[in-house]
Amino acid sequence: FCQLLAADRVYLTRAERVQGTPMVKSRWWMRLETVLKALGADIAGLEDEAFKSWADFIDRAEVFRRLPPPEPRPPVEARPRVMSASAVENWMRDPYIIYAKYILKLKKLDELEQDLSLKDYGTIIHAVLEKFNNRHPADFPENAKAELLELGREYFAENKIAMETRAFWWPTFEKTVDWLVGAERNYRPQVRKVHSEIEGSFSFEAPAGKFTITAKADRVDETTDGKINVIDYKTGYARSVKEVEGGYAPQLPIEGLIAKFGGFQNIPATEVGRLIYWQLGRQETVIENNMNELLDKSYERIVTLASVFDFEKTAYISQPNPKQAPKYSDYEHLARVREWSVTENEE
């Protein structure tokens, strides 16, 4: 450093910001400025735009070329023959997720010190409601609120939920229970029997052979009019009717198809009456118009999707329609989305 500093012309530079955060000058740097000022040097004149231009040129490419998105085409025998309802949505919105997760079998590692999230709160709600509905599949007791709150206390205690987390979540849980009890009082008279956290599937023939769609429904209700209602609990964002009808939220229609085909254990093939989102603590979204047409279109989309991907020339491209891309993906960096999604006129 001393030898370099003794050269005829020396440029000393420092970062004023790192990732947007202002950086404090080092004591040595401030001492150097003081000495230069004492010698009468024009420090202000050294801070010229030319230096910034030189810095920009370090990472500047002579030619900007838009990179193509990945287009993996694994052999058909390596492609999945069983798909869950939640995976079907990713299949529609971002096929690359299916390639990375189910063909390459890559899985994101958990954080070493992972905080509890809204997903964990949702797990609590599902566990409490499953236990309650299994106790009361054909009735709704007068003391339902007290029983649900007691089940919640038991879950928090058994799973050793930290007191600070409990203090934050418990008021929300109480609010959810209040909303749920009100909704159930209006809804349960229509229900003959409730089935909670029930698994099911249906299969069809695709070009490369049998293909199976699976799902685990939060709730499937046999109603007094001889039909089936399917309910999906949501502690966060609930899907809109438009998303469901457009095919971009296929989970409930898939569960409806399983019910229609008799794919849930101990529930005979039955006409589907309603698909329902319960955004717990907030609102209810009911889909019941043109139900047979909705389910038929959903079935056609799934069969078409499986048929298209049964040909090796079909690539698992990433985000074919950016406007319908998933809100979050563990594999976006592997697909290099930020590289190829930049337009040719951007740097």
Residue spans for each PLM region:
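Active-site-adjacent bridging/hinge elements
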Residues: 95-106, 148-153, 221-234, 274-279, ...
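Conserved C-terminal motor-coupling region of P-loop helicases
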Residues: 1-42, 234-236, 241-243
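Secondary-structure capping and boundary motifs in well-ordered enzyme cores
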Residues: 80, 88-96, 113-124, 144, ...
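Non-catalytic protein-protein interaction segments used by genome-maintenance enzymes to assemble
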Residues: 195-263
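C-terminal, charged and often intrinsically disordered regions of DNA end-processing helicases
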Residues: 30-131, 194, 322-323, 327-336, ...
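Glycine- and acidic
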Residues: 12-13, 73, 77-86, 105-115, ...
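Metal-dependent nuclease catalytic regions and adjoining charged, substrate-binding loops involved
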Residues: 16-19, 27, 34-52, 146, ...
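A non-catalytic, helix-rich entry segment at domain boundaries
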Residues: 124-205, 289
